[in-house]
């Protein structure tokens, strides 16, 4: 199955953007201008399945899928880098991370609505579940807008594979249910999808980011 996602930043998302990503407050109008320019390039969607048919996962209820922002953001970032506009490329990365975190939340709500179950935990491959599941998930979902390289890299770059543990009981707010947070601080560098998960859960915490 496939669903369109429409992640956007709200006024609250801008309140601590500069402190979180170490920009001067004077840069915010320029950052917002880049956001306005990139938003039409976002073609976010999710490919997913509610079938419990993955080898190696024994949960009674789960869903799995890919969430992507599409190729446009990658192309804009590459364009800036080609012109040695490093700050602009960094701004695109920062904004796209927040957009990806919004897409995760939107996707989780889609799964809850369609399954009639509640999200108990959101996991990313490489954390609770092995990256060895990636080819199997890719084969089952056959996402036409997402590629998988021989090195098991997903393209576009702002794409993640997720396992959503579902339950009949209602759980806490979605932001408390991402298991990436338990391992995030063990790494000096982390992929954009994983970082977006951490941003999603800890929107109030400023920190340094290493790409």
Label each PLM-derived region with a short phrase.
Residues 1-84, 88, 159, 205-211:
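Active-site helix-to-loop segments that bind/position phosphate- or nucleotide-bearing substrates
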Residues 23-26, 30, 91-95, 99, ...:
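Catalytic cores of large soluble enzymes that bind and process phosphate-bearing ligands
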Residues 30, 34-38, 103, 107, ...:
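General structural feature for long, well-ordered alpha-helical segments within catalytic domains
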Residues 38-49, 98, 102, 106, ...:
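Short secondary-structure junctions and interdomain/linker hinges
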Residues 52, 79-81, 184, 192-195:
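General "foldedness" signal
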Residues 59-126:
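Conserved mixed alpha/beta catalytic, RNA-binding, or beta-rich assembly cores of soluble enzyme
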Residues 118-190, 196-211:
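Short terminal or interdomain "cap/linker" segment that borders an active site or interface and mediates
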């Amino acid at each position: 199955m496939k669903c369109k996602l429409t992640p956007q930043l709200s006024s609250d998302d801008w309140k601590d953007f500069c402190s979180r990503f170490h920009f001067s407050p004077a840069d915010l109008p320029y950052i917002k201008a880049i956001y306005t320019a990139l938003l039409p390039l976002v073609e976010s969607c999710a490919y997913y399945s509610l079938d419990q048919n993955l080898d190696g996962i024994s949960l009674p209820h789960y869903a799995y899928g890919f969430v992507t922002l599409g190729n446009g953001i990658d192309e804009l970032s590459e364009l800036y880098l080609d012109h040695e506009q490093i700050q602009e490329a960094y701004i695109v990365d920062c904004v796209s991370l927040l957009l990806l975190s919004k897409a995760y939340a939107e996707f989780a709500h889609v799964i809850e609505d369609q399954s009639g179950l509640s999200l108990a935990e959101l996991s990313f491959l490489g954390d609770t579940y092995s990256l060895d599941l990636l080819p199997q998930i890719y084969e089952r979902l056959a996402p036409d807008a997402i590629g998988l390289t021989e090195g098991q890299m997903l393209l576009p770059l702002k794409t993640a594979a997720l396992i959503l543990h579902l339950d009949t009981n209602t759980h806490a707010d979605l932001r408390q249910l991402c298991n990436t947070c338990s391992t995030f601080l063990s790494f000096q560098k982390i992929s954009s999808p994983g970082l977006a998960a951490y941003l999603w859960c800890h929107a109030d915490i400023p920190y340094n980011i290493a790409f």
